[in-house]
Amino acid sequence: MKVAVVGGGWAGLAAAVEAVRAGHAVTLHEASRQFGGRARSLSLAFPDGRDVVLDNGQHILIGAYSQTLGLMRTVGVDPAQVLHRLPLTLRFPDCDGIALPDWPAPLDAGWGIATARGWSWRDKLSLLRHAAAWQLRGFACDDTLTVAALCKQLRPAVMQGLVEPLCVAALNTPADQASARVFLRVLRDALFGAPQGTWGASNLLLPRVDLGRVLPSAAIAWLEREGADVMVGSRVQAIESSGATWLVDGRPFDAVVLACPSSEAQRLVGAAGIEAGDWLARAGSLAYKAIATVYTTGGPRLDVPMLTLRSDVDSPAQFVFDRSQLGGPDGLLAWVASASDGDTATLEAKVVRQAARLGWTVQPLRTVVEKRATFACTPGLRRPATFIAPGLVAAGDYVEGPYPATLEGAVRAAQAAVTALSGASRKAG
């Protein structure tokens, strides 16, 4: 089949690679001048005139991201060369919190809970009892529950030191608003997922090169070597059904994968003259949350690449990353405020004060705000389906699936979309 993939973010790249591997002739359209979507590189100018390539936001992968890691290997990227691995660690600057040892699951989680600092034995037993109950239920629960409701019997120290930061990191949604079902799915895969070689499913994987080198650059090079038509700066204006084919800006294709942002997909589907009311309604009902990354200079070298922070309205960042341990210059810190709001100047001022309360003096360098970073992962959410119309599918982290808006969610959605097209093609044949 001739397949058009609209969008060159991680979902679009995954869809294009999967389609080529399935034997299809692929044309990839990317509207901007850069591939990677919301996980892309950017250049930062330092006060001394140096240019440093960083990212539009600090991303975290985990060892359970099997499809993302597999995609990287397919296009020639060795994850061990571009990702810094460390066992799951949610430690605060005062050293309280949990840090798992580099052991097989579930021994790592058990020991991490037993040795968590700042927790009483009652706190630890509370978490162990809840974890055992969740496992007995297959990490499933009523779809109407929030994470806060699911964990209402947990001790406050565990909620504040583990559940709340883990929830906002994974779902970008506060615990009192976040879907317990999706949260449990992430926990299940992280705690009991299959290891990736020597990497445990719960391991944190932090990029130590810019995001362009983690996947997009290699994926584009691979696609071009395999004969795909890669078009950059090519915003698709319209798609149209024409009998058994689809016209993409007048060019005929057998199938189309919409791997662009949901707003762009809605624009194209809404003007395509097809019956897609339910899909459009679901896509249009999604609410979105921002993620802000404040880059600062002058910070100390941290004991570990990543620290968890106690966050409130005056201390917006939930995590801080020492970029000097991840391939960046000394003193560069990345402060991540998930589910953030407010203007950039106010956010920067709050982060500077948050750092001062830790005894650190920092200066803002640049703040990147992705206003539509993720959908709000709330209970009972009805996400749009992969299938839109015969020969037309959607791929993206917002599409129906078990994961929240993550890189793994985007890759899995893309692969599912291409599988659906290939299956339909075989049936038609």
Regions found by a protein language model. Name each.
Residues 43, 103-104, 318-429:
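Conserved flavin/dinucleotide-binding core of flavoenzymes
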